[in-house]
Amino acid sequence: MTSSLPTVQRVIQNALEVSQLKYSQHPRPGGAPPALIVELPGERKLKINTILSVGEHSVRVEAFVCRKPDENREDVYRFLLRRNRRLYGVAYTLDNVGDIYLVGQMALSAVDADEVDRVLGQVLEVVDSDFNALLELGFRSSIQREWQWRLSRGESLQNLQAFAHLRPTTMQSAQRDEKELGG
C-alpha cells in the first residue's frame, strides 16, 4: 500500500490535534511537506521538541535529548546502548558534535493515529525517564558546581532538587542550610 505524502501529513496533523499537542510547521526545500515540530510536555525535561519529517518512503522522527556529555562518556554511551535494546520505533544516536538524539522512522504505510501516538509516547517516556540519569552521568561535576554557586549566592535551588544527593555537604553549606531553614 502506498500512501501519498499529503495524506500522511494530514494523518499526522490530525493525530496531533486529537492529542492536543502543540506543533508548528517548518518549511523544507525541494517541495517536501513541511516538517512538523511537536512540543511534548515532559516532567523532568519540561519540553521535548520532536521533529516529524515526511519523506518519500518513511516519516523520520527526531528529538534532541541533551548536549554532548562533559564527562564519563563511556558510561553515558553504555547507558544509551543498553537502553536502545528496549525501545520501540526510536533509538539513541549522536550527531556530528556528540549531542544525544532519539531518532526513528515509520513506514508511510504504517502511519495512522495509533502509530503516531505510540512513537511519540515512546519519545516522551524515554526522554523524560532517562533525562536526569543522563545529566547525572555526563554532567555530574557541572551540577555540583552549580549547587555550590547557587548556595554561595542564595539563588533558587528549585530546579536542582532532582540532584539533591549531589548537594555539597561541607560544614559551610550545612551552616547555610541551617540559616535558610531559620535555625
UniProtKB/Swiss-Prot annotation:
Top-level taxon of the source organism: Bacteria
Matching entries from InterPro entries are given as: Put_sensory_transdc_reg_YbjN
Output the Gene3D superfamilies linked to this UniProt entry.
3.30.1460.10
What family is reported? To M.leprae ML2442.
Name of the protein in its database record: Uncharacterized protein Mb0497
